[in-house]
């Protein structure tokens, strides 16, 4: 056992200030966020204990300086919450004597959280420094009060020893200084300092909260004092956050860092200063020697020192019930004779004295209050180094006196119900004290010291325990009545203590609390059930240090959420649906054993929620049966904002709790297994990792990750109140999103019995997923899984807009869906399984077999070698360039086999080598159906032998269904100079070019003739072999390995190269002749349509001749259809011009209706919507959606009318290959119409401007101006109410030229001048129910011809032709006139040479004066 000299260790840290006999850390710099000073004082935000190099920025975001560069951040837990004192001994604080207004102190966290169980320590004696005595040479404004209990929440701070203040100016030995206080709060500005005036902003009164920072620099020293001076607006040697004292800071502590001892020490307490400027402060140095010699020694008069050699002393303790007691030591004599006794008198609680009394303070006017009764009790020190026994004869109240033990002791009562009451128990290192006595009800036993308190009395103890250090073992035994309770309430505080259970019934679990900074609850292999765990902060820790027994923690949640109406001081936490535990489960110290511990969440109802926001490190399982279980990080704690609304707005911070969504603490959770047997488990935001295997079952569900820019349920616990809230939050702020890490889910996930798991957003699963029994798994919203998915028995997995790095295996009616994602790994599907791809792409890594496959606008890439550059040109892989078939797994061609049904629509992407007739393949059953596109990337080399490249084959030689359709992307595959088409031959699909195949056939015939010559010179066996090969359908031009045959082939190849060279240097006419000669021979294996060959040949001619179009124009019949040859850029240019002109025609169509209609409206508006599809031989089909709005006015004349129409048209056009175009047209038109009897004659003129823009980012708007004029005539036949009106008209259009560039393609459109002809007839019938109402249905047929307009548009250097065609319009409408209002509506159908069958509707409203 370690022997230590009796000198109590005391540790405290705090800062405070006094002003000229008054309590004055209240001045801070307005240019720095006030929250820095608040967080500094409470060890929150950046200023956590031990932090270093803390950067401080001003309100403009500029770096002011760095705090704590030479020392770790101090622990301010030793400072009283009112800021006027600091803990320097087990029950002693230090301050200034003129602070007479405080009679108690408390320690710990701020806030109203009832789980903290804040304890009030009463001052029983002031211990004012008696300066008038000769032996006391220092100022009398100093005291070190004694408290009635040992303080458990904090460890006392060490004190400086030198009373010569100048030694502390040495910044080498003392590089850091800080202070803290709760005086009046002022904000000081640069201008205040420059003009030497009081600080501008008085923001708070004294004693409401703490602020802290570094001190000013030392400017002088006196007799037991030091003086510091400076200003708060400028950083100094100690840091960027200097603070100055104000009224209310008297007694607040100043701390200094001892570089040699590497620890913070309390240096002084603030006495004087400049209360309105925050400049100089005067401090009283700490008087350590006086404390030990004249304070602690007086309060610990009874000292039983250790004996050498150790003895087993027996002590008897009895109260005389008059404020004194007798302590008798019986020990054997050294010579072994009769035992000897030592008797001592000790002071106890003295009820005969006053409860409170006043003590005159000479350092300041007034009196101090103290408690004579309590103070009368003194400490007892027992230093027996054997195994001592202390027997308490009767109930003892030791007042403010406590028991110190050095060595092993047994403390027992004469009877089981004997009680002891006092300041507490302190046990030295390596010592164990067996505690067999009770403490009275409502009394708290304070346990300090690093030794062990073994509580093993009998019966039911009604007192409570606060464990602040060392270990407490609860091993209470049952009395004769079977009652057993170690304590009614057990508190674990300061983070230094461990409470160990030796049975489950030592204390009611719901009466265990983790106070300020918590500590360890060691279950020691036993199990507890909590309604909720009372906890204050992340210092709470529940562990199992037992090496053999498993322990369980069960949490049930609050049974009732309705608080009783007849009860006062309701603890809302006991009636809340949502509860939280902010501490740890499982040991985190690697030097301590982490035994097996299981956590079970078993709420009574489904609407209960448990938030775990601390962490777990379990060798055991986490099990949930119902309710909601959240795993989450937590907001970084910040000091509470006590400022009122005005000051808070100036600082730009919310009132009350400071929670910034971008400033959270990440948490980790670890368990062997997560068993989710019911309810919902949620792994929420700021969980950096969660480790363990998951099993989700019985309709339960689990969700991992949060999704940016979507609503997420986030749960947080208030540090201030302890209450937990869960709310829906939309994570849209970029700063917040960037602060949330991607949750690493390390482990496998198993789903059974209709379970559901969702992994989405900021989450990554590193493990496999197994699903059975109708369970569902979803990976979505950019989440990632690295691992395999295995599905069976009707399970369903979906990957939607996410990344899966692993294989998928399906059995027994399972289903897998890939949506909005790209997948690079293997999928294998057994019988009755289905794979569905929706807006997805899948790249196969190797051969794949599936049962059923459904594509919905998706792409399957059969080979990773397939890729395309931005301009759709193939990007070649070396493996496909080789002249031999690739053999390695990386470079081979792949086969996709679908044994069941292929359905839907999508794209299959292949790699191929026509040179070697090798490619990826698709093998299908005769159940396959649907429409698909094949995209083939070829090496670019032309074939040199005659074979067939089959891409799609049937299984078991069964023909494929006619319901199965494949279309080649771009209708061709380029290979060398030719384009290959997709043909269906004997139920299979292959690439085919008749010209090339005929050419190769001719080469093969010549090769066969050469072989026959060689065969005559060879033995019969060789000849037979060569003959057999020649008959094969897939025979190569080179078929013999013999030297003579190979030599002949070399000669043939050389000749072929020579012929190719000649062909390339010949004129186009020679090329055409060669192609025609190739067509004259028959291709016996694959018959083909000669007309198709003609078209294909002509197309080749057109492609070769395009650069010479201007010089050698050819008619349309020779060229084929232009739209099949032009690029998307050319097509978009022609489509854009067509769409612009058609918008102008739409305006004229409305004017044509106006001329035919005899409406007399003076003012009208017209709205027309239509959707049209245009197509021609010049450009590919496009769709135009137009919204036309018109306002018109007209004036009636004697024999006619005149008027004007303003038109505005907006069009959304979709050209081929989904090229988007947006266009507007604005026109102003005027018209006049004259009537001779039934004959009408009219004229019109118009001018307008169009603006059009392609959707590509680099394109600019295309502007065109246009004018038109025209004439029209009509004749009206009237047969009663029936009217028949034929009409005709012509309009001349002038459209200016426009040159522009789109994606580096130059487009030139010439100026246009053309006529638009129209003719038609209208039939109507008029009903007149009353004089003021008429109704007129009508039928209208109109024919428009613009075929005379031929345009030549130049794209780069190629001239393209374009016309505008003709079209019919049929319209049915109804016109009604009520009083002066006119309303008409119509439905029309249109169709023409370039216009498909279309419908449009219109509404017109007019008014006539």
Swiss-Prot record:
Keyword Membrane part of the UniProt annotation: yes
Cross-referenced PROSITE patterns: AUTOTRANSPORTER, PEPTIDASE_S6
Region entry Disordered, spans: 866-888, 1016-1078
Peptidase S6 domain ranges (all copies): 26-294
Enzyme Commission identifier(s): 3.4.21.-
Keywords recorded for this protein, A-Z: Cell adhesion, Cell outer membrane, Hydrolase, Membrane, Periplasm, Protease, Secreted, Serine protease, Signal, Transmembrane, Transmembrane beta strand, Zymogen
Biological role stated in the UniProt entry: Probable protease; promotes adherence and invasion by directly binding to a host cell structure.
Protein name: Adhesion and penetration protein autotransporter
Gene name of the encoded protein: hap
């Amino acid at each position: 056992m370690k022997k230590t000299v009796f000198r109590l260790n005391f540790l405290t840290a705090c800062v405070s200030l006094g002003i000229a006999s008054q309590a004055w850390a209240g001045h801070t710099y307005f240019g720095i966020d006030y929250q820095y000073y608040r967080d500094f004082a409470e060890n929150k935000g950046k200023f956590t204990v031990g932090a270093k190099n803390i950067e401080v920025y001003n309100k403009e975001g500029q770096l002011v300086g760095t705090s704590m560069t030479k020392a770790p951040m101090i622990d301010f837990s030793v400072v009283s919450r009112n800021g006027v004192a600091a803990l320097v001994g087990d029950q002693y604080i230090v301050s200034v004597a003129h602070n007479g207004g405080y009679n108690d102190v408390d320690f710990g966290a701020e806030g109203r959280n009832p789980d903290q169980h804040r304890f009030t320590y009463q001052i029983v004696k002031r211990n004012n420094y008696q300066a008038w005595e000769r032996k006391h040479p220092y100022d009398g404004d100093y005291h070190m009060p004694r408290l009635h209990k040992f303080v458990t929440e904090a460890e006392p701070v060490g004190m400086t020893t030198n009373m010569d203040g100048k030694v502390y100016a040495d910044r080498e030995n003392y590089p850091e200084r800080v202070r803290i206080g709760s005086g009046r709060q002022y904000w000081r500005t640069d201008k205040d300092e420059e003009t030497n005036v009081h600080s501008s902003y008085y923001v708070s009164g004294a004693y409401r909260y703490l602020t802290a920072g570094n001190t000013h620099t030392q400017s002088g020293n006196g007799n037991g004092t030091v003086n510091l001076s400076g200003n708060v607006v400028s950083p100094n040697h100690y840091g960027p956050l200097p603070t100055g004292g104000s009224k209310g800071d008297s007694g607040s502590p100043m701390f200094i860092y001892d570089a040699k001892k590497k620890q913070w020490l309390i240096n002084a307490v603030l006495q004087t200063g400049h209360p309105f400027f925050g400049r100089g402060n005067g401090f009283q140095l700490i008087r350590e020697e006086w404390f030990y010699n004249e304070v602690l020694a007086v309060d610990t008069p009874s000292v039983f020192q250790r004996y050498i050699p150790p003895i087993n002393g027996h002590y008897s303790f009895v109260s005389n019930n008059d404020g004194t007691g007798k302590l008798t030591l019986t020990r054997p004599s050294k010579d072994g004779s009769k035992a000897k006794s030592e008797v001592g008198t000790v002071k106890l609680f003295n009820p005969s004295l006053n409860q409170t009394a006043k003590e005159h303070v000479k350092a300041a006017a007034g009196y101090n209050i103290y408690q004579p009764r309590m103070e009368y009790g003194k400490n007892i020190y027992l230093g027996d180094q054997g195994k001592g026994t202390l027997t308490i004869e009767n109930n003892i109240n030791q007042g403010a006196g406590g028991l110190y033990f050095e060595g092993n002791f047994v403390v027992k009562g004469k009877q089981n119900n004997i009680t002891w009451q006092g300041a507490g128990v302190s046990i030295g290192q390596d010592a164990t004290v067996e505690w067999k006595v009770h403490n009275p009800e409502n009394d708290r036993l304070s346990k300090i010291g690093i030794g062990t308190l073994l509580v093993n009395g009998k019966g039911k103890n009604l007192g409570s325990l606060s464990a602040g250090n060392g270990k407490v073992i609860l091993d209470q035994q049952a009395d004769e009545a079977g009652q057993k309770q170690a304590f009614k309430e057990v508190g674990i505080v300061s983070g230094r203590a461990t409470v160990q259970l030796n049975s489950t019934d030592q204390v009611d679990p719901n009466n265990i609390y983790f106070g300020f900074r918590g500590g360890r609850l060691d279950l020691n292999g036993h199990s507890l059930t909590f309604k909720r765990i009372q906890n204050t902060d992340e210092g709470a820790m529940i562990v199992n240090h037992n090496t053999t027994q498993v322990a369980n923690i069960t949490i049930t949640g609050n049974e009732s959420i309705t608080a009783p109406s007849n009860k006062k001081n309701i603890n809302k936490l006991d009636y809340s649906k949502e509860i939280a535990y902010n501490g740890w489960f499982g040991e985190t110290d690697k030097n301590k054993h982490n035994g097996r511990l299981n956590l079970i969440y078993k709420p009574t109802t489904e609407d209960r929620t448990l938030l775990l926001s601390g962490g777990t490190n379990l060798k055991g399982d986490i099990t949930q049966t119902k309710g909601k279980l959240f795993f989450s990080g937590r907001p970084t704690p910040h000091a509470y904002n006590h400022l009122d609304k005005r000051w808070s707005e100036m600082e730009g911070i919310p009132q009350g709790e400071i929670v910034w969504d971008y400033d959270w603490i990440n948490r980790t959770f670890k368990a062997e297994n997560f068993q989710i047997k019911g309810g919902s488990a949620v792994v929420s935001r700021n969980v950096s990792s969660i480790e363990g295997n998951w099993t989700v079952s019985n309709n339960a569900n689990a969700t991992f990750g949060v999704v940016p820019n979507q609503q997420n349920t986030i749960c947080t616990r208030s540090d201030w109140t302890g209450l937990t809230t869960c709310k829906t939050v939309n994570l849209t702020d970029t700063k917040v999103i960037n602060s949330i890490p991607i949750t690493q889910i390390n482990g496998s996930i198993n789903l059974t019995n209709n379970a559901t798991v969702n992994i989405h957003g900021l989450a990554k699963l590193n493990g496999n997923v197994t699903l059975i029994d109708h369970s569902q798994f979803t990976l979505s919203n950019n989440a990632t899984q690295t691992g395999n998915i295995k599905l069976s028995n009707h399970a369903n997995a979906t990957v939607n807009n996410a990344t899966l790095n692993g294989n998928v295996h399906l059995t027994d009616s399972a289903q897998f869906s890939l949506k909005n994602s790209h997948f690079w790994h293997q999928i294998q599907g057994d019988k009755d399984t289905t794979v569905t791809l929706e807006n997805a792409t899948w790249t196969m890594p190797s051969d794949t077999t599936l049962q059923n496959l459904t594509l919905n606008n998706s792409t399957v890439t059969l080979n990773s070698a397939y890729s395309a550059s931005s301009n759709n040109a193939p990007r070649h892989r070396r493996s496909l360039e080789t002249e031999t078939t690739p053999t390695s797994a990386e470079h081979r061609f792949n086969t996709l086999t679908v044994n069941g049904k292929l359905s839907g629509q999508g794209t299959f992407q292949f790699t191929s080598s026509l040179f070697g007739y090798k490619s990826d393949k698709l093998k299908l059953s005769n159940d396959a159906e649907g429409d698909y596109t094949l995209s083939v990337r070829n090496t670019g080399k032309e074939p040199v032998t005659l074979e067939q490249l089959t891409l799609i084959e049937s299984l078991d030689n069964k023909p494929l269904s006619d319901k199965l359709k494949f279309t080649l992307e771009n209708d061709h595959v380029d290979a060398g100079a030719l384009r290959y088409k997709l043909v269906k031959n004997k139920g299979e699909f292959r690439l085919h070019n008749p010209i090339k195949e005929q050419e190769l056939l001719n080469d093969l015939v010549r090769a066969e003739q050469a072989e026959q010559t060689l065969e005559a010179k060879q033995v019969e066996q060789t000849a037979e072999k060569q003959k057999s090969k020649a008959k094969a359908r897939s025979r190569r031009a080179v078929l013999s390995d013999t030297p003579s045959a190979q030599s002949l082939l070399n000669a043939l190849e050389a000749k072929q190269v020579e012929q190719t060279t000649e062909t390339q240097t010949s004129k186009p006419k020679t090329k055409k002749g060669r192609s025609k000669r190739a067509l004259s021979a028959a291709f016996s294996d694959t018959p083909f349509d000669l007309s198709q060959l003609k078209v294909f040949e002509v197309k080749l001619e057109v492609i070769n001749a395009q650069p010479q179009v201007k010089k050698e124009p050819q008619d349309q019949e020779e060229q084929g259809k232009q739209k099949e040859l032009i690029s998307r850029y050319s097509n978009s240019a022609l489509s854009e011009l067509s769409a612009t002109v058609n918008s102008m025609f739409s305006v004229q169509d409305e004017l044509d209706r106006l001329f035919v209609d005899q409406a007399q409206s003076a003012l009208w508006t017209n709205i027309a919507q239509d959707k049209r599809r245009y197509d021609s031989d010049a450009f590919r089909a496009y769709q135009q959606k137009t919204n036309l709005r018109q306002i018109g006015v007209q004036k009636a004349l004697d024999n006619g009318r005149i008027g004007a129409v303003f038109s505005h048209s907006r069009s959304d056009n979709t050209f081929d290959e989904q090229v988007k175009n947006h266009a507007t047209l604005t026109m102003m038109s005027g018209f006049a119409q004259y009537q001779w009897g039934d004959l009408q004659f009219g004229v019109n003129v118009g001018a307008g401007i169009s603006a059009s823009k392609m959707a590509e980012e680099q394109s600019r708007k295309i502007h065109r101006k246009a004018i038109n004029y025209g004439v029209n005539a009509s004749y009206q036949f009237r047969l009663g109410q029936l009217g028949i009106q034929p009409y005709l008209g012509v309009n001349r259009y002038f459209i200016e030229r426009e040159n522009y560039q789109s994606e580096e393609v130059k487009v030139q459109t010439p100026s246009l001048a053309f006529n638009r002809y129209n003719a038609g007839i209208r039939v109507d019938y008029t009903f007149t129910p009353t004089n003021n109402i008429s109704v007129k249905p009508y039928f209208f047929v109109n024919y428009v011809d613009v075929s005379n307009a031929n345009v030549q548009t130049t794209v780069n250097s190629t001239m393209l032709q374009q016309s505008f065609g003709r079209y019919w319009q049929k319209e049915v409408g109804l016109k009604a006139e009520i009083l002066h209002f006119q309303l008409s509506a119509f439905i029309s159908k249109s169709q023409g040479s370039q216009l498909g069958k279309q419908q449009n509707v219109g509404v017109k409203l007019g008014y006539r004066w």
